[in-house]
Amino acid sequence: MEIQRIENMCGGNGHVFLKPILNEKQLNGKCGLYAEVTLEPGCSLGFHMHYGESETYYILTGEGEYNDNGTSWRHVKAGDITFTPDGRGHGLANTGNTDMVFMALIIKD
C-alpha cells in the first residue's frame, strides 16, 4: 500500500509517514488502523484521545518521549510497547537523532 505523508498529525510537529499494513476491507470493521509509522527526528504525533477504541504502539527503532494521557511523559525506545485504552489519550515525539519507526494498532471496542 502507498505510504502517506501527513503534516502536523493530531497537531504534532513536522510530518508523519504512515504505511498501512491492511486495507479497510482486511480490517473488517474490527480495527481502525494497522500501520507502520515513521517519525523523523524532531517530528511528533500530537496528543489525541481515543473513544470506542484502544491503540497500541510497538517501537521498532529509535527513541522518543511518550505522552501518557496528558499527565506524564516517559522515555520509549526500540522494543517498548505502549497501550492507550478507550477514553484515554496519548502522543509521541521523536527526540532522538534517527528515525523512530513503530507499529500502530487501533482495535475497536
Predicted segment positions?
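A short, N-terminal "cap"/entry segment at the start of jelly-roll beta-barrel domains
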Residues: M1-G32, G46
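Conserved short histidine dyad/triad with adjacent acidic residue
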Residues: P20-N23, A35-Y51, D86
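Histidine-centered metal-chelating micro-motifs
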Residues: S44-G46, E65, T82, D86-L92
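Short histidine-centered beta-strand/loop micro-motifs
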Residues: L45-Y51, D68, R74-H75, A93-T95
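Glycine- and acidic-residue-biased ligand/ion/polar-headgroup-sensing regions
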Residues: G52-S54, Y58-G64
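Short acidic-glycine-tyrosine-enriched beta hairpin
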Residues: G70-D86
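Ligand-binding loop in jelly-roll beta-barrel domains
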Residues: W73, D86-D109
